[in-house]
């Protein structure tokens, strides 16, 4: 048995409800046609091969001998129905895949898109497209019928998810007999749960708590693809409408120091995108560099000058901006 601490549960376990499906893949209950490896490569899951036949046609060969958690065989027709159900229930998902039609051809699924969509495979790895038995939706909000190595046996919103090994899993016998997943959203409480051995593993070790786990623990660092960014309000009412102000801000930020403080050494000081996960980062020219003198020069040329309060001002109005961040994550 293993106890796991996650930093977030969805409101439900319905794969089509908002972003709730992410919990299903994290706990080993749900699977998609393909998935992504830690080094960002596509690998087969419920489809064992695929082909982009032409700009608007994709062919997926559906893995044989797969069963849903209720014992029903997973057929290409079942996969078709699952994808179509997801598109019907989730406008966000339908918009991402741009699917015009899905047809069954033997063990293959033929997907036609409304336009060339090179990112279709990537979109189908999104947890919203976990394959489920849509003929068995009576408990979809708490016990969706999926295909993963672990079967959901109970769900208590905001508390726990209980799972049991699925004996008929296509990938062989799961490594654990059972798993308890706990919803521990507070970073400090999650860290304390691991320290006290209330859980065996936690997701998302807050940077401020990394030092607690130097001895006797194994922290795995992986290059992420999530980008936390500040978006500028370009409307005329905002001082950021002025390109000079935006440029000055880009030059005044000390990226390395900010990364060291916020990421506690685990986050690279880079902008505008993380170098570890974005193709083409190294080719970006004129990356913003910390240069306070340059920022001062830019603002001066734009008509700003320091007033008696030491604040930059223009036409008698001090330069001031308001920053709003997502307040749920205290690590930010």
Question: What does each model-identified segment do?
Answer:
Residues 236, 269-308, 326-332:
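Structural transition elements
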Residues 51, 93-134, 154-156:
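Surface-exposed binding/hinge segments that line
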Residues 164-169, 224-248, 252, 261, ...:
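A bilobed periplasmic-binding-protein/Venus flytrap-type ligand-binding module shared by bacterial periplasmic
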Residues 166-212:
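Ligand-site clamp/hinge motif
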Residues 41, 124-174, 178, 188, ...:
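Gly/Pro-rich hinge or "lid" segments in bacterial periplasmic/extracellular proteins
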Residues 48-90, 110, 239:
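Aromatic- and charge-enriched surface segment that lines or borders ligand/interaction sites
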Residues 213, 240-278, 289-298:
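Periplasmic-binding protein-like
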Residues 5-53, 84, 145:
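N-terminal lobe/hinge region of extracytoplasmic solute-binding protein
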């Amino acid at each position: 048995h293993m106890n796991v601490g996650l930093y977030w549960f969805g409101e439900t376990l319905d794969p089509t409800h908002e972003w709730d499906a992410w919990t299903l893949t994290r706990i080993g209950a749900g699977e998609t046609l393909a998935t992504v490896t830690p080094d960002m490569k596509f690998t087969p899951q419920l489809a064992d091969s695929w082909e982009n036949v032409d700009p608007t046609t994709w062919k997926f060969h559906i893995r044989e001998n797969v069963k849903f958690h209720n014992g029903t065989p997973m057929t290409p027709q079942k996969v078709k129905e699952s994808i179509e159900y997801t598109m019907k229930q989730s406008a966000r998902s339908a918009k991402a895949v741009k699917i015009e039609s899905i047809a069954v051809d033997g063990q293959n699924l033929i997907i036609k898109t409304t336009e060339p969509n090179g990112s279709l495979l990537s979109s189908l790895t999104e947890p919203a497209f976990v394959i489920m038995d849509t003929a068995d939706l009576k408990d979809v909000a708490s016990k969706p019928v999926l295909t993963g190595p672990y079967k959901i046996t109970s769900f208590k919103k905001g508390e726990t998810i209980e799972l049991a090994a699925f004996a008929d899993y296509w990938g062989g016998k799961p490594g654990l007999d059972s798993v308890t997943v706990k919803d521990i959203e507070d970073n400090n409480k999650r860290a304390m749960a691991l320290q006290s051995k209330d859980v065996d593993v936690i997701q998302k070790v807050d940077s401020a708590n990394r030092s607690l786990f130097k001895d006797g623990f194994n922290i795995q660092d992986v290059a992420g693809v999530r980008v936390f960014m500040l978006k500028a309000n370009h409307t005329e009412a905002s001082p950021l409408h002025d390109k000079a102000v935006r440029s000055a801000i880009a030059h005044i930020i000390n990226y390395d120091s900010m990364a060291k403080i916020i990421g506690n050494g685990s986050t690279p000081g880079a902008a505008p995108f993380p170098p570890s996960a974005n193709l083409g980062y190294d080719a970006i020219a004129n990356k913003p560099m910390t240069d306070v003198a340059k920022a001062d020069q830019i603002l001066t040329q734009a008509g700003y000058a320091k007033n008696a309060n030491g604040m930059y001002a223009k036409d008698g109005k001090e330069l001031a901006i308001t920053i709003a961040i997502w307040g749920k994550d205290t690590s930010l």
